[in-house]
Regions:
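Conserved "right-hand" nucleotidyltransferase catalytic core of DNA-directed polymerases
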Residues: 2-9, 188-189, 196-424
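Conserved DEDDh/DEDDy metal-dependent 3′-5′ exonuclease domain
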Residues: 3-205, 245
Length: 424
């Protein structure tokens, strides 16, 4: 069905007859531009579902175009019950499929048909390779999005506001236009496919101007391996996780009691006689919790005890104060001013530990666990820095975590190697 929008004419494919006609057009073409639009399968996987998570998304649209074609195709995969003929295009090694973020397209293809695409090419990685090799992005508006690509390389701005719109319902002409422009081009431009034009231009630069064919091969192969890493995720031992949180909560309560002692707050005791021998439990007073949650009042209270300047409770500030206190030496080797310095060291050290424990306990760890796989899934970038180094990030998706920060997390429990790999 032909749809004429403000910026582009497109073919919207919703019937078997229309799909068959498209397949005839595609047959024998060696180069295609392809792109998905997805939505979160909230009905099946609940509020943790995400349109960016291959395990909990639904592929709604697939846009297709080829060189010289001014009327891109938008295939409604759901209306056609996700036809296997589309899967076969992804598997066809004789057809190069150019996608902007091919890692995501590979993941969606795996989620939809259970296969990994063959001969798929990532234009974003190509864009990043040029940026890393030349420093191009350092002097221009930063970013490697599709909008940045067509703006900076082809001088064609695109409105990307509908990227996060709801693709699960009846689609509007504006949504169809948005989808079509991911593989097409505005009718008043000099292009028919912005994606393919940018691909041809940048690849020529990479291969012939900068003579970097080996770099292209390595990074284009790498993004598929990264996609597999994202798909598989990391298994979680829930027994260890529960032990971790329980231990962290117990230590947090203990540090609240320590802070209560520093500020001379009275602590109640509860005696339990049910087990025969009396069991004494110390109860964290409410007023220490209130004080610890009031930074202004806490700063004021600490300043009354310590001979140092303190105007906030940021980690760097507290660490600086701690170093200052720790570096003060008395001539006679005794503690300064009746132990005030040592008290300050204890208070600041305990406060730093309390802040770490609070973050551990308050983090919604369950949100990181995929509701379908039971694993945690990081997001990786083949080229994540200006130097070309691989990176990990949780940006843009609350269901992902930053795998680069794992080594900076101070664990609260000692995990024996054999426990780490238990099945349960």
């Amino acid at each position: 069905m032909r749809v004429n929008t403000d910026l582009v004419d497109l073919e919207y494919i919703t019937t078997r007859e229309e799909l068959d006609a498209l397949l005839l057009e595609i047959g024998g073409r060696p180069l295609l531009a392809m792109d998905y639009e997805t939505y979160a399968d909230v009905e099946t996987w609940g509020p943790q579902a995400s349109a960016l998570d291959p395990h909990t998304l639904v592929a709604r649209l697939l846009q297709i175009n080829w060189p010289g074609n001014a009327i891109p195709y938008v295939v409604d995969l759901r209306a056609l019950d996700w036809p296997t003929e589309i899967r076969d295009i992804w598997l066809d090694s004789s057809v190069r499929k150019v996608c902007f973020n091919a890692r995501f397209e590979a993941l969606v293809t795996q989620a939809t048909w259970g296969v990994w695409p063959d001969n798929i090419y990532c234009a974003m990685v190509l864009f990043q390779q040029i940026g890393a090799a030349t420093g191009f992005k350092a002097g221009r508006t930063r970013g490697y999005s599709y909008g940045s690509l067509v703006r900076d390389i082809l001088d064609t701005p695109l409105n990307k506001e509908l990227a996060s719109s709801d693709w699960s319902g009846e689609l509007t002409p504006a949504q169809l236009q948005y989808a079509a422009l991911d593989v097409g081009a505005p009718r008043n431009s000099n292009y028919t496919s912005l994606l393919l034009e940018a691909y041809a231009l940048l690849r020529n630069e990479l291969l012939y101007t900068y003579e970097m064919p080996q770099v292209e091969d390595i990074d284009q192969a790498a993004f598929m391996e990264i996609a597999r890493m994202e798909w598989n995720g990391l298994p979680i031992n829930m027994n260890v996780m529960r032990s971790f949180l329980s231990t962290a909560q117990s230590e947090l309560d203990n540090y609240k009691l320590r802070m209560s002692a520093h500020f001379d707050f009275s602590v109640d005791q509860v005696v339990d006689w049910n087990s025969g021998a009396p069991q004494v439990t110390l109860v964290v007073p409410d007023k220490i919790t209130v004080l610890l949650n009031n930074p202004t009042a806490l700063v004021s209270r600490i300043q009354k005890l310590l001979p140092v300047e303190l105007d906030n409770l940021q980690q760097k500030t507290l660490e600086t104060v701690l170093r200052e206190l720790d570096s003060e030496d008395d001539e006679d080797g005794a503690t300064s001013e009746e132990g005030i310095r040592d008290l300050g060291i204890q208070i600041i050290s305990d406060l730093l530990r309390y802040k770490k424990l609070t973050k551990m306990v308050s983090t919604n760890w369950a949100a990181l666990i995929n509701p379908r796989t039971g694993n945690v899934h990081a997001r990786y970038q083949t080229i994540g820095t200006s130097t070309g180094r691989m990176s990990s990030s949780s940006s843009g998706d609350t269901n992902k975590f930053n795998a680069q920060q794992i080594s900076n997390v101070e664990l609260m429990v000692n995990i024996e190697e054999d426990r780490l790999f238990e099945d349960n």
